[in-house]
């Protein structure tokens, strides 16, 4: 607990963020995107005038996927240089509605570098919990939850149902219905 919370100057706990994202949560999620994905940018190895072009970089395929499948915009609107592209992504992220932020984070988790996926999702869940969000990643999707116990129960049930053909889809549907009814 911070000094200001102990002194009663600011609330000790935040209101659950169900249909909103405050600045702290938004910044936390952006920082995770930066640490797990954006900072890993590597331009092409060729001798070129600039090495920060998106084309030929390790993030080129992800940028195409974002523009084609998430933004649904023409790929010729992707910025040529990484810093400009990153600025555009950042503006979208910080200017977007709360649900657009979750859509974007979920999209990156599902389409970004697979080697970072599990650690990224784990880090997101820690920050979502810390910032009192009503959402967590469950089975690769951002889902509304009510408690840590509920997350563990859903994930455990999904893992158990993998041994029963067809069971996973029924369980996933039931979990979504139960969580949304709260």
Residue ranges and their predicted role:
Residues 1-53:
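Long, contiguous, compositionally biased segments that the model treats as domain-scale units
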Residues 43-173:
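Internal, Lys/Arg-enriched amphipathic helical interaction segments that engage polyanionic partners
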Residues 174-178:
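A cyclin-like helical interaction fold
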